[in-house]
Amino acid sequence: MKIGVLYEQREDTEEYPGENQDIESGRRRKRPKLDREQIYDALEKLGYEPSYIQLDGRDASLFAVAKEDVDLIFNLVDSYGGDDAKDLHIPAFLELIGAKYTGSGPHGLLLAQDKSLAKKIIGFHGLQTPFSMVVHRGRVDYAHDIKFPMIVKPVSEDGSIGISNDSVVDSVKELMERIHDLHEQFEDVPVLIEEYIEGREIYAAILGNDPPEALPLIELDLSKLPADTPRIAGREVKFDRDSEAYRVTKSAVAEDLDEKTTEKLQEAAKTTYRALKLRDYGRIDMRLSKDGTIYVIEANPNPWLTKGAEFAMAARGSERTYTQMIKEIVEAAVAR
């Protein structure tokens, strides 16, 4: 089977951004070069015929995809023309030309991208999510009464873009300043204000479709952060190599959770995955509070797939090799 590894060409980074370096380039992020290279190598080991298909943000490169002689496209495009908000148009185009591809479709990407809408859907399915409201310039959409502390972030960004230690606010003055800063930085993108939940940062990798499987849970351990630092996975934790927050945090399989709590977290993740129409693979981010309450924070339909990323870490925890993980993603897409 011929498989085209589809990606957008931007400045490459040789390392996994979540672990090794700052990936922010203005507003947008760069997908790691190793992501596509490791997937390509895994596809070769599996006996497939992989090839690279490159987008460069110009329409000609997109239209050329229709002429590619491949049986499946392994879609690694999470932006178009450097704009993350346009990632859903790539699978929409692939469907228009009748191409098979891995990962979530445009519907799932849209639902996951709009955090406010996703929270409403998650709540409808009986899951807990932090109380929130959305602020536009000159207008506030109230959902609930929220108490301080709050966390303030763009409503439609991912990869911790727009989130830093300053995102957690404790007063009206700090709240208004943060809203203003985000509206300036993100060109009037609506701002999501959420109740800040103190607790453990849990990631659930989901693999497959009918039924989806929740892999072993991963925890980003924030317990060693300085006392005056909010326990969030912001820029300092993920990308700022010179910060203490970066040095003292790490992800690992959450081995100390009891069986009942683990099952509840995995079920919440699978419910979220299905409710938001995700498919083939994805990651659900949650908070586990001190009293055992599970809060679904957001869904990531296209998490990084490098060997050092949390998704591959979870796959290893289930005794899968990296190559087996890629094989199952391919098989899930082909079976649809």
Please provide the spans of the model-predicted regions:
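Active-site nucleotide/adenylate-binding loops and adjacent lid/helix of ATP-dependent enzymes
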Residues: M1-Y7, V65-D69, L110-L192, E198-R200, ...
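Phosphate-binding site of ATP-dependent enzymes
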Residues: V172-A252, D256-E267, K290-Y295
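ATP-binding N-terminal substructure of ATP-dependent carboxylate-amine bond-forming enzymes
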Residues: M1-K100, H107, L111-A112, R137-Y142
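ATP-dependent carboxylate activation and anion-phosphoryl transfer catalytic cores
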Residues: I121-G123, D256-R336
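Alpha-helix N-cap recognition
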Residues: G57, D170-S171, T321
